[in-house]
C-alpha cells in the first residue's frame, strides 16, 4: 500500500493485488459495499492518518480505479461538512464512487533513465518495440498500449517491467497534462537504437 497526499483534503492510495489478497479480497469485491471492503477502507484511513496526518473527520468520497494487471488506485476526498467525531468511520459517511477503468494499457514509472534503457534493451530482444516515453517530476514513465504487448504474455510483460520500475499511481492523463512527452512512438525501439545499439557500435 502506497499513500500520497494530493492536497489538503484529498489523498491517493495505490493498492497492489497482493494487498487485496492478503485481506481476502479480489478486485471485483471493491465494486461491492461488503463488510470486508468497509474494513479495508477503515484500514486505509488509519494508515493515511498515521503516515500523512490525513484525518477522516467528516464525510469522505471514495473513487476506485482499476489499473490493468497492476492494482487499484483509490482517491479519497474529505468533504467539507461537520460531523460528530464519534461517527468518524460510520458506513453512511463513506460515499462510494466506483470508477471502473479496465484499460488494457500499462503505465510504469522509473526512477532513472538507466532503468528505462536496461528495460528497453531486454524488451527489444524479446520483440517488443512500441510504447511512449514521458518524464514528469524527475521520473520517467513508459506507456504501452494493448496492441504493443502481443509479443509477450501480459503476466510475463508485467513481471519484466516490475524488475526495473513500479506501476504508476499517476494516471496517463495527469502525466500528459503536467509532464513532457519524450518519444511518441516505438519508444522501446528508439531507446534501444540510440542508447544500446549505438553504444555497441562505438
Curated annotation (Swiss-Prot):
Keyword match Nucleus: no
Highest taxon above the source species: Bacteria
InterPro entries: MecA_C_sf (IPR038471), Neg-reg_MecA (IPR008681)
Pfam families linked: MecA (PF05389)
One annotated GO molecular function: protein-macromolecule adaptor activity
Keyword set, alphabetical order: Competence, Sporulation
GO biological process, one term: sporulation resulting in formation of a cellular spore
Signal peptide: none
Description of its domains: The N-terminal domain has binding sites for ComK and probably for unfolded/aggregated proteins; the C-terminal domain interacts with ClpC.
Record-stated family: Belongs to the MecA family.
Alphabetized PANTHER family for the sequence: ADAPTER PROTEIN MECA, ADAPTER PROTEIN MECA 2
Protein purpose: Enables the recognition and targeting of unfolded and aggregated proteins to the ClpC protease or to other proteins involved in proteolysis. Acts negatively in the development of competence by binding ComK and recruiting it to the ClpCP protease. When overexpressed, inhibits sporulation. Also involved in Spx degradation by ClpC.
Record note on quaternary structure: Homodimer.
Protein name: Adapter protein MecA 2
GN (gene name): mecA2
Amino acid at each position: 500500500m502506497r499513500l500520497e497526499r494530493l492536497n489538503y483534503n484529498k489523498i491517493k492510495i495505490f493498492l497492489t493485488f497482493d494487498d487485496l489478497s492478503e485481506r481476502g479480497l479480489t478486485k471485483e469485491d471493491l465494486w461491492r459495499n461488503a463488510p470486508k471492503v468497509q474494513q479495508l477502507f477503515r484500514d486505509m484511513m488509519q494508515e493515511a492518518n498515521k503516515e500523512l496526518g490525513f484525518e477522516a473527520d467528516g464525510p469522505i468520497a471514495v473513487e476506485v480505479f482499476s489499473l490493468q494487471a497492476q492494482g487499484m488506485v483509490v482517491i479519497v476526498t474529505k468533504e467539507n461538512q461537520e460531523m460528530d467525531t464519534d461517527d468518524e468511520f460510520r458506513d453512511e459517511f463513506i460515499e462510494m464512487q466506483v470508477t471502473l477503468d479496465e484499460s488494457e494499457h500499462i503505465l510504469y514509472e522509473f526512477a532513472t533513465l538507466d532503468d528505462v534503457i536496461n528495460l528497453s534493451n531486454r524488451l527489444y530482444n524479446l520483440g517488443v518495440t512500441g510504447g511512449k516515453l514521458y518524464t514528469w517530476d524527475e521520473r520517467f514513465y513508459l506507456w504501452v498500449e494493448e496492441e504493443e504487448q502481443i509479443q509477450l504474455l501480459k503476466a510475463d510483460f508485467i513481471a519484466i517491467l516490475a524488475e526495473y520500475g513500479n506501476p504508476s499511481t499517476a494516471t496517463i492523463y495527469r502525466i500528459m497534462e503536467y509532464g513532457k512527452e519524450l518519444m511518441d512512438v516505438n519508444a522501446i525501439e528508439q531507446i534501444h537504437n540510440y542508447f544500446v545499439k549505438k553504444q555497441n557500435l562505438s
